[in-house]
Amino acid sequence: MDIAEEAAKNSYSPYSRFPVGAALECSDGTVFTGCNVENAALGSTICAERTAACKAVSEGHRDFVRIAIWGESRDYCMPCGACRQFLSEFSTEMEVLCAKAGGRYVSYKLRELLPHTFNY
């Protein structure tokens, strides 16, 4: 979770002022980080989870086992619907750790957060 919190420091979030960081672990132990990157055209914003996943895929990794998501919030920082669907393309069994300020976190399997994925 510390790695995800550290990744949030690189966030570009001038509109929401809500920095988020993610650390995505692959089956070989490689970890890819990501942060949210906002844009004035809000639909162009990319979440921390998808940033980390795109970095992993671009480096040849698709075997995701765990993702930690950290946001400076009183509530647990849960992945949005788009991120849930995006990650499910690679594994519905991956562990999703959702943290909040103060170091507490909850853990789910991705399939619990998105029980009915879209498949083409």
Cite the ranges covered by each PLM segment.
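Residue-level structural signal for beta-strand termini and adjacent loop
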Residues: 36-37, 110
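Small-residue (primarily alanine) positions within well-ordered alpha-helices
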Residues: 4, 22-23, 52, 56
